Amino acid sequence: MLKLFAKYTSIGVLNTLIHWGVFAFCVYGMHTHQALANFSGFVIAVSFSFYANARFTFNATTTTLRYMMYVGFMGTLSAVVGWMADQCSLPPLITLITFSAISLVCGFIYSRFIVFRDIR
């Protein structure tokens, strides 16, 4: 399990760079609300994360159902964190750090035990 989490974390670093880049562009370049910026960053980064983790972490085939399950769960998590950040007037950097930490742990657990549960 630790080896899987290490692989998931490695892909998560790349995913985080993608997410944070899009988030920064939306907040600072387009002046959007954090909820929209966080969700936009998520949408772009989640596809990379799903396919990379399916292939390199879980050695699994990708299916539309698995993709929809992963995107649905992680998208809801992203929107909730962004909405809460707006409600609390959190600085964007705190929002990014918070979402990155929550999504790493929750995403791994959800992927391992729900999305790719029949693998390995």
Curated annotation (Swiss-Prot):
Localisation per UniProt entry: Host membrane
Membrane-spanning intervals of the chain: 10-30, 34-54, 65-85, 90-110
Keywords, sorted A to Z: Host membrane, Membrane, Transmembrane, Transmembrane helix, Transport
GO terms for cellular component: host cell membrane; plasma membrane
InterPro entries given in the database record: Glc_translocase_bactprenl-link, GtrA_CellWall_Glycosyl, GtrA_DPMS_TM
Record's bilayer topology term: Multi-pass membrane protein
Protein's GO biological process: polysaccharide biosynthetic process
Annotated family: Belongs to the GtrA family.
Role: Involved in O antigen modification. Involved in the translocation of bactoprenol-linked glucose across the cytoplasmic membrane.
Protein name: Bactoprenol-linked glucose translocase
